[in-house]
């Protein structure tokens, strides 16, 4: 997958530590097309000390890790976004003023993919009070939920999944969301997704429903919060929404810490 923040973060971090970086564009690589993942892994593993992969299937990054012989970092797959979790955990720690195991956060929206999955597992592993607010059809898979509950038994985390957005955000320190339509999905899914998720939009009213005047808003970006992008304008013209998963008022408010997070 193409990238802005993830690529820049990896390249800046590597160069700050004195490492060289090579970027292979999706269109310029033969991975999985003319050369198998297994063969590519064994070639790159002989040239590089580490590999960062950002793509679609989790099975690809796992196969790279199996055969490369060097560390492989998951920069994002459809299923997980672990390096974003490092940023999210640090951001919550910086802004909460209390230990993570005393911190509560909610994720509202489509929770089936990398951010919903990863935040649920993150909260469980760190002993946090983590809530998912979404229609049940958009919850993480049973396997992810089971893994979160297993981790929570070890850490004392509290896991809540609910279809009630206001219940999800009650007394939390942070409210997370993400885009409602993921990269690679067709435009045709927008109407269905908007119908399903309209009650999970992060608005000033939902922020207030937390009952916490210090609650913070988080989003891994990019966000559809206004009409200033081609997609944002198309959504407005097609569905009448100025901002989708979050309103401009929340995104640009003092409660928004998305740029610290990103």
From Swiss-Prot:
Name of this chain's protein: Ornithine carbamoyltransferase
Underlying gene: argF
Compartments, record wording: Cytoplasm
Main location group: cytoplasm
Entries under NCBIfam families matching the protein: orni_carb_tr
Annotated residues for binding of carbamoyl phosphate: 3-7, 30, 54, 81-84, 219-222, 247
EC number: 2.1.3.3
Function: Reversibly catalyzes the transfer of the carbamoyl group from carbamoyl phosphate (CP) to the N(epsilon) atom of ornithine (ORN) to produce L-citrulline.
Effect on the protein of changing residue 100 to W: In strain: HF116
Known outcome of mutating residue 60 to T: In strain: HF116
Pfam families named in the record: OTCace, OTCace_N
Entry's Gene Ontology cellular component terms: cytoplasm
Catalyzed reaction equations: carbamoyl phosphate + L-ornithine = L-citrulline + phosphate + H(+)
InterPro entries, sorted: Asp/Orn_carbamoyltranf_P-bd (IPR006132), Asp/Orn_carbamoylTrfase (IPR006130), Asp/Orn_carbamoylTrfase_sf (IPR036901), Asp_carbamoyltransf_Asp/Orn-bd (IPR006131), Orn/put_carbamltrans (IPR002292)
Keywords (A to Z) from UniProt: Amino-acid biosynthesis, Arginine biosynthesis, Cytoplasm, Transferase
GO-annotated biological processes: arginine biosynthetic process via ornithine; arginine catabolic process to ornithine; citrulline biosynthetic process; L-arginine biosynthetic process
């Amino acid at each position: 997958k193409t990238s802005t923040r993830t690529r820049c973060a990896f390249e800046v971090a590597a160069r700050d530590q004195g490492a060289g970086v090579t970027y292979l564009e999706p269109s310029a690589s033969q991975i999985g097309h003319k050369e198998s993942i297994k063969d590519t892994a064994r070639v790159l593993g002989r040239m590089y000390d580490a590999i960062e992969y950002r793509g679609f299937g989790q099975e690809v990054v796992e196969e790279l890790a199996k055969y490369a012989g060097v560390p492989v970092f998951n920069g994002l797959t459809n299923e997980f976004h672990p390096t974003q979790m490092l940023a999210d955990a640090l951001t919550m720690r910086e802004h909460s003023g209390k230990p993570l195991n005393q911190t509560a956060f909610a994720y509202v929206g489509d929770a089936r993919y990398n951010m919903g999955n990863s935040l649920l597992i993150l909260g469980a592993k760190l002993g946090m009070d983590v809530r998912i607010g979404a229609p049940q059809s958009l919850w993480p898979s049973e396997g992810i939920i089971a893994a979160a509950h297993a981790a929570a038994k070890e850490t004392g985390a509290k896991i809540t999944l609910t279809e009630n957005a206001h219940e999800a955000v009650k007394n939390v320190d942070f409210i997370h969301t993400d885009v409602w339509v993921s990269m690679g999905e067709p435009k045709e899914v927008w109407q269905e997704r908007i119908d399903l998720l309209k009650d999970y939009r992060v608005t000033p009213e939902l922020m207030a429903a937390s009952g916490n005047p210090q609650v913070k808003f988080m989003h891994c970006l990019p966000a559809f919060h206004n009409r200033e992008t081609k997609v944002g304008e198309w959504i407005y013209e097609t569905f009448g929404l100025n901002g989708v998963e979050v309103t401009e008022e929340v995104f640009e408010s003092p409660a928004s810490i998305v740029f610290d997070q990103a």
